[in-house]
């Protein structure tokens, strides 16, 4: 369910939002903010995934895999 929320933006962000709307990429401020929040949510999920991987590695026994193999797997796991 949609909810009306008031947001105060500084001059820089207000200008940026205006540019995005003027470019035609977005129709209004709400579209800009929703897209920005979706991107932020996705980034936070990736950060949490990396944190979980670090914690798992910290708690795991010693690995016999080469560092290159571990790094390649980590890059593959964090790719979106």
Swiss-Prot record:
InterPro entries: ParD, ParD_sf, Ribbon_hlx_hlx. CDD domains: RHH_NikR_HicB-like (cd22231). It comes from the Bacteria. One of its GO terms (biological process) is regulation of DNA-templated transcription. Keywords: Plasmid, Toxin-antitoxin system. It holds the Pfam family ParD_antitoxin. The keyword Protease does not apply. SUPFAM superfamilies: Ribbon-helix-helix (SSF47598). The keyword Transmembrane helix does not apply. Antitoxin component of a type II toxin-antitoxin (TA) system. Neutralizes the effect of toxin ParE. PANTHER family: ANTITOXIN PARD (PTHR36582:SF2). Belongs to the ParD antitoxin family. This is Antitoxin ParD. The lineage of its organism: Bacteria, Pseudomonadati, Pseudomonadota, Gammaproteobacteria, Enterobacterales.
């Amino acid at each position: 369910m949609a909810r009306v929320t008031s947001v105060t933006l500084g001059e820089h962000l207000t200008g940026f939002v205006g540019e995005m709307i003027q470019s035609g990429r977005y129709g209004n401020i709400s579209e800009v903010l929703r897209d920005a929040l979706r991107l932020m949510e996705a980034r936070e999920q990736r950060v949490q995934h990396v944190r979980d991987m670090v914690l798992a590695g910290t708690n795991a026994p010693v690995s016999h895999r080469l560092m290159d193999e571990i790094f390649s797997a980590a890059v593959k796991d964090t790719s979106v």
